[in-house]
Amino acid sequence: MSILGGSRHWFGPAVGAVAITCLLYYFTSGDSAVLGRALVGLILVVVILFMPAGALGLVSGWRHVRRNRATAAAKADASPVGHTVSAPVVRLKTTITAEPLLQVSGLSKSFRGVHALSDVTLEVRKGEILGLIGPNGSGKSTFINLVSGHYKPTRGEIVFEGHNLTGLDAHRFAQAGIARTYQIPRPFSHMTVLENVAMVGMFGGQGKSRAEATRDAQSFIEFAGLEHRAHALPDDLNLHQRKFLELARALAAQPKLLLLDEVLSGLTPSEINEAIEMVQRIRDRGTTIVFVEHVMRAVMALTDRIVVLNHGALIAQGNASDVMNEEGVKAAYLGKAHA
């Protein structure tokens, strides 16, 4: 019901409930009842694909378009000839001047008609921590899966250190120097903490011998504060320790670019503080980081720039404090009525 009416406003579910009730009441029995249920299903599919904000969202969108056109016309009348209206994507001034490490152009990904990512163009600069934020379902994890090679793009290019990696398999991305973590840690359950980290050194693109990989794994485990759990199995670790094991495994690949996908989810405030300090130390080692996270105090503390996605589209990028004050970003998180 909230899908049909819209979930961004309290009145949306009520609109959806009335529409569905009336439709089912009209088709009350026999074949008509089956037809009614089929029509409800078809309507919901159409709404999900073409009206993700629901009926109220569509009406609100029309109102915003009319208001924006009126505002733009008023500004045009008051402005000198030659004045141009700014682009809808916010590109704010930043002090980062390092050369680009990762460049994506027109990156898009669709799943059977559902557009998970649409024409995203951005760059990750060498040595920075770039925050990637947005509401649930905005395309953040899809972006991570694309630039780590786990998904192949529908359109667009992925260039890393000047080399076009578009369409290559995930192990080629790893060999190029891109590593990632997962929202839910995925260690090998039958291997110890030390063995899990050493495995990455042997087969994650470095090609080290078992002895060398084990020696280096010990240092990464110490970096993550897990040296006292080196011979424990993953099932014997708590969530905090499993998250840090995930970081140690990613670091064992010695990446140039590290993609962190919600490493703070499920952690306590004190554990989040430890994780923030660790991410800072990882950057201090010279690793560039893309930081996908919902914990905004961590995003504000760590990132040099942030990029905001919503419904698969890039809607803002720039300095964290400035971007979070943008009306489009507020609308993405809180709904248009609160923007």
What do these predicted regions represent?
Residues 1-46:
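Transmembrane alpha-helical segments in multi-pass inner-membrane proteins
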Residues 4-8, 51, 222, 334-335:
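Residues at helix-coil transition
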Residues 10-11, 15, 38, 55, ...:
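Hydrophobic side chains within well-formed alpha-helices
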Residues 22, 37-43, 63-65, 220, ...:
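Short alpha-helical linear motifs
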Residues 28, 32, 51-52, 203:
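Short helix-capping/hinge motifs at transmembrane helix termini and TM-loop junctions
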Residues 51-61:
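Juxtamembrane/interfacial segments flanking transmembrane helices
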Residues 60-108, 337-339:
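ABC-family P-loop ATPase nucleotide-binding domain
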Residues 96-103, 108-339:
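Glycine-rich phosphate-binding loops of nucleotide-dependent enzymes
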